Regions:
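Alpha-helical scaffolding within the catalytic cores
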Residues: 79-81, 131-134, 242-255, 285-297
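Non-catalytic scaffold segments within catalytic domains of secreted glycoside hydrolases
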Residues: 222-255, 271-277, 282, 320-321, ...
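Conserved, mostly hydrophobic/aromatic
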Residues: 149, 264
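Glycoside hydrolase catalytic-domain groove-lining segments
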Residues: 253, 259-260, 266-320
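N-terminal signal peptide
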Residues: 2-5, 10-51
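A solvent-exposed, charged loop/short amphipathic helix patch at secondary-structure junctions
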Residues: 113-117, 161-197
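Disulfide-braced loops of extracellular cysteine-rich modules
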Residues: 353-363
């Protein structure tokens, strides 16, 4: 899981360990039922996740808390992965915004075109050249951390550019009319859509390909992908949390993106309107289920055994409720980490390790037997201690299964391949 953005200047990501996309349910690529695994799936990889049954990754620029206000967060004590000196960009976790990776084309608020404005007007070669230079300046050659590309100005699917993003549709159609004034409105829209989507695909796909080629050990993916579009509306009389109708078909059309990604980073940011509501769990649940569905169907390159990590982005605050880390905010954050979040992560990590040892001989991580089932590592105080408690072995065996780390096989991950583990 990644802890993510503060509203304006900061990303506050906390990344928790890769979620499992293995299931013993009947095969399907629709809904929440995921494919049957004949053999235990190989656990999602990446050196930062290697041999870790559970991981939380910090991506908040809290270096300023110590440097400016002498407020220190002892993240290492709680086994939370952090960049050196808690820097925003580092070798464990980094994020690239629109103006910090190549020449990303977008329309400014006043309508002017930046780097061509539209994907079909961008200079892909110049973009890739600059992007590679920027990556080399920021990342070490052996970089093996989390690498997130955060481009949110437009979507690669035409119909998902609604609201203010419809300007990309309007200007794309205007471009076609200038080139082909003989076409009807329907023909103009169809051609504009095709050119936009083809160019958007090429831009995103080639960016990922280049990044993975130069830093193959990194976990590369786009923030907010796959999407679910399940925000609760004021008009909703009953909220199920399910993804918007047509979401799965749209995400299936992005198979080219999933095949180039080495990690998926769905957003589970909670809006203020869901504070204290059980609907928050429904929203998060279905966003993660859709990401797991995508990860279960497509794999990076030709790797058909190792799962793509699903690393949800979460905030420590509700969206748009914080803007800047002043001394007071830093103190509140420190207290929250030291008294609530840190102990919870520590206790949950302990249970995950215990499950790994009991079920998987310490050579894999535990995953629910059925993703839609309710058993979890956390429960009520009658069965466990106050935080995450200590489940007995029977609970683990009845509700969880193993995803073996690379180099291990078998239902209990007890068969080792020394050559693979080197």
């Amino acid at each position: 899981m990644v802890l993510s953005h503060l509203s304006l200047p900061f990303l506050l990501p906390l990344l928790v360990s890769p979620l499992s996309c293995t299931s013993r349910s009947p095969p399907s690529t629709r809904g929440v039922v995921l494919p049957r695994a004949a053999q235990p799936a190989v656990a999602a990889g990446g050196l930062i996740l290697q041999d870790r049954p559970f991981a939380v990754v910090w991506n908040i620029p809290t270096e300023d808390c110590h440097r400016r206000y002498n407020v220190s967060l002892d993240l290492g004590h709680f086994d939370i992965v952090e960049n050196r000196q808690q820097r925003f960009h580092g070798q464990e976790m980094t994020i690239f915004y629109r103006d910090h990776l190549g020449k990303y084309p977008y329309l400014s608020p006043d309508g002017s075109r930046v780097n061509g404005g539209l994907p079909q007007l961008s200079d892909l070669s110049a973009h890739l050249s600059l992007a590679m230079t920027q990556m080399s300046g920021l990342l070490q050659p052996n970089f093996s951390g989390l690498a997130v590309i955060d481009w949110e100005e437009w979507w690669p699917l035409w119909e998902r550019n609604f609201g203010t993003k419809m300007e990309y549709q309007r200007q794309s159609k205007l471009l076609v009319r200038q080139e082909r004034p003989d076409l009807s409105e329907t023909e103009t829209t169809a051609l504009a859509r095709r050119k936009f989507e083809e160019s958007a695909r090429r831009f995103m796909e080639e960016t990922l390909k280049s990044a993975v080629r130069v830093h193959p050990k990194g976990l590369w993916g786009f923030y907010g992908f796959p999407a679910c579009l399940n925000k609760k509306k004021k008009t909703d009389k009953s909220y199920t949390g399910r993804c918007q109708a047509g979401t799965e078909d749209q995400n299936d059309r992005l198979s080219w993106l999933w095949r180039q990604s080495t990690a998926l980073y769905p957003s589970v940011y909670l809006p203020q309107s869901l504070a204290g509501s059980t609907d928050a769990a429904l929203m998060v649940r279905h966003r993660l289920l859709e990401a797991l569905r995508v990860a279960s169907v497509w794999h990076h390159g030709n790797n058909t055994t190792q799962a793509i990590p699903v690393l949800p982005y979460a905030r420590l605050a509700f969206t748009h409720s914080l803007t800047f880390l002043d001394k007071h905010q830093c103190s509140l954050l420190r207290d929250y980490v030291h008294t609530v979040l840190g102990p919870f992560v520590q206790s949950l990590s302990s249970d995950m390790k215990r499950c790994s040892l009991q079920l998987c001989n310490g050579n894999g991580r535990c995953a629910r037997q059925r993703l839609t089932s309710s058993p979890a590592m956390t429960s009520d105080s009658k069965k466990t201690n106050v935080l995450t408690g200590s489940f007995n072995g029977k609970h683990f065996h009845n509700n969880f299964m193993c995803e073996c780390y690379p180099g291990w096989t078998g239902q209990e991950c007890h068969h080792g391949n020394r050559q693979k583990r080197k």
